[in-house]
């Protein structure tokens, strides 16, 4: 069985360590732990790995956040992957820093990457792992906040939370969304 795990983020060194790029960070850590390397392909950087009898395609779209749906649709079609085997890794302002929540459907929550995915796939029924980045910013400064790097205090806990996100990805692919939500959404 095939899975597409897509991390949302923006390409370029300028954004590499920003809160908005947590999806890319999780995929980079997952690729490193699995000893696989990303290759630049159509619509993004892609890596693949075997997890027991599953084939995981890891995608970092090169379309920038607001057009992520194009890359995701392309790779779903190219690899003939069912949408229920799609998992989006995304930052979430409404969750405290480091909180992790798996959802099988829902609104875009104001996230432009999710908006584009829902528009492009024509559905809100797809899996997403929401990584809390908090909302510790003054009114009107949301864009600066998500594009800023994590604070020193947040960085102390970042690798541990990324490791937990990887556990959730593995569980999703091996056990499915319901079991994974029951195990990790606490």
Swiss-Prot record:
The record marks 91 as: Stabilizes the basic form of H active site to accept a proton. Its EC number is 3.1.1.29. The record marks 10 as: Discriminates between blocked and unblocked aminoacyl-tRNA. It catalyses: an N-acyl-L-alpha-aminoacyl-tRNA + H2O = an N-acyl-L-amino acid + a tRNA + H(+). GO terms for molecular function: peptidyl-tRNA hydrolase activity; tRNA binding. It comes from the Bacteria. Hydrolyzes ribosome-free peptidyl-tRNAs (with 1 or more amino acids incorporated), which drop off the ribosome during protein synthesis, or as a result of ribosome stalling. Catalyzes the release of premature peptidyl moieties from peptidyl-tRNA molecules trapped in stalled 50S ribosomal subunits, and thus maintains levels of free tRNAs and 50S ribosomes. This is Peptidyl-tRNA hydrolase. The gene is pth.
């Amino acid at each position: 069985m095939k899975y597409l795990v897509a991390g949302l983020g923006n390409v370029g060194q300028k954004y590499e360590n920003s809160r908005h790029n947590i999806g890319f960070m999780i995929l980079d850590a997952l690729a490193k732990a699995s000893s696989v390397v990303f290759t630049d392909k159509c619509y993004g950087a892609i890596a693949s790995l075997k997890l027991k009898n599953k084939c995981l395609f890891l995608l970092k779209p090169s379309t920038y956040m607001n057009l992520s749906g194009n890359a995701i649709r392309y790779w779903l079609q190219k690899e003939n992957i069912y949408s229920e085997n799609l998992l989006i890794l995304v930052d979430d302002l409404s969750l405290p820093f480091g909180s992790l929540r798996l959802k099988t459907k829902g609104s875009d929550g104001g996230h432009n990457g999710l908006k584009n995915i829902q528009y492009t796939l024509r559905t809100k029924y797809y899996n997403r792992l929401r990584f809390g980045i908090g909302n510790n910013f003054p009114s009107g400064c949301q864009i600066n906040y998500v594009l800023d790097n994590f604070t020193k205090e947040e960085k102390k806990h970042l690798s541990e939370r990324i490791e937990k996100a990887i556990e959730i990805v593995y569980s999703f692919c091996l056990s499915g969304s319901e079991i994974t939500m029951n195990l990790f959404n606490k």
